[in-house]
């Protein structure tokens, strides 16, 4: 029989561990199992080393982030074609995948609601970003079966996207499960949060379904942003100045490509906005971590002084 880990707060000082608390996808060591109302309860005492860790930055900035999952092999970006496909949102998710050093793919849903020209346009925008782009209707069993065959058996996938994108519907189709799905408002095409927590569902592939994300900040990893916009990163290597901001400096290869029509101004604009936000989030994150480190050091010093006083009291 399995053991149910009903206590996340472990004995001892495990909460001081840098990996604490555990997130969906974590492997944990359990101890102190005891029978409780016919079920085994246990304390999680250690988090096993992670192969990957995905977090998303808060849209508000301030260096805050929210964990998505751990030990994931592939980020599946579920982006609806209706009511409004957003390449900017896809780019931000791809940057998060690069920051986590995992693969990413794009699944374009609601392909039955738009014209073929729109589908092809969305695919062409996504293709430079990821290795695999699929457009489908989640009720098309053959298309879903082909998508399922493209996954590596045994991999752990995490589905991310906006509310109403069809993540839970896609999960149901892939695994034959029955997660709750919600209706999409006809007025604006936005869905409600039917998935309110992250959960790991096991099958031929392990799928983590996540709540919809309404606003997505830029990863604080500026290098991951450059990895997302590969065309601009390659051009930047040819700029005269290493710290070129691509804003009109002499010898700017990016500006030259823009003038010659080889680079879209919309792509450059999205890159510059994400890069600026990424650098700002990185500064805020580093400042927050420094404050946390100071508080931890102060707490440890206080504990040390108390222990010293206790030992001195014993000596008397």
Map each language-model feature to its residues:
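Beta-strand/loop nucleic-acid-binding surfaces
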Residues: 2-22
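Helix-rich effector regions associated with P-loop NTPase G domains
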Residues: 17-27, 31-41, 48-71, 103-104, ...
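Switch/coupling subdomain of P-loop NTPase systems
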Residues: 43, 63, 70-72, 83-102
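Conserved beta-strand segments of the P-loop GTPase G domain that flank and frequently precede/overlap
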Residues: 76-81, 107-109
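Structural motif
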Residues: 76-78, 158, 207
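Conserved ATPase-coupling elements of RecA-like P-loop NTPase cores
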Residues: 86-90, 115-120, 217-221
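Canonical P-loop GTPase G-domain recognition
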Residues: 103, 112-165
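Walker A/P-loop
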Residues: 163, 167-169, 173
């Amino acid at each position: 029989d399995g053991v149910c880990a009903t206590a996340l707060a472990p004995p001892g000082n495990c909460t001081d561990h840098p990996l604490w608390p555990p997130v969906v996808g974590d492997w944990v060591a359990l101890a102190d199992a005891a029978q409780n109302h016919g079920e085994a309860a246990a304390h999680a005492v250690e988090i096993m080393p992670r192969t990957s860790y995905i977090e998303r930055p808060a849209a508000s900035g301030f260096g805050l982030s929210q964990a998505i999952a751990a030990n994931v092999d592939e980020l599946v970006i579920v982006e609806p074609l209706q009511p409004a496909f957003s390449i900017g949102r896809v780019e931000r998710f791809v940057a998060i995948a690069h920051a986590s050093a995992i693969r990413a793919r794009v699944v374009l849903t609601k392909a039955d609601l738009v014209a073929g020209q729109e589908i092809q346009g969305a695919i062409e925008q996504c293709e430079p970003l990821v290795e695999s782009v699929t457009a489908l209707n989640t009720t098309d069993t053959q298309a879903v079966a082909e998508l399922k065959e493209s996954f590596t058996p045994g991999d752990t996938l995490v589905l991310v996207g906006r509310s109403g994108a069809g993540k839970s519907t896609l999960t149901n189709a892939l695994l034959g499960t029955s997660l709750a799905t919600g209706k999409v408002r006809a007025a604006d095409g936005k869905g409600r949060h039917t998935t309110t927590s992250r959960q790991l569902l096991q099958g031929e592939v392990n799928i983590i379904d996540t709540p919809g994300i309404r606003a997505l900040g830029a990863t604080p990893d500026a290098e991951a942003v450059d990895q997302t916009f590969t065309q601009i990163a390659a051009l930047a290597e040819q700029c005269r100045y290493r710290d070129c901001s691509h804003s009109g400096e002499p010898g700017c290869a990016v500006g030259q490509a823009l003038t010659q029509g080889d680079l879209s101004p919309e792509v450059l604009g999205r890159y510059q906005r994400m890069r600026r936000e990424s650098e700002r989030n990185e500064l805020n994150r580093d400042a927050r971590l420094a404050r946390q480190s100071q508080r931890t050091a102060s707490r440890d010093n206080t504990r040390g002084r108390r222990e010293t006083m206790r030992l001195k009291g014993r000596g008397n």
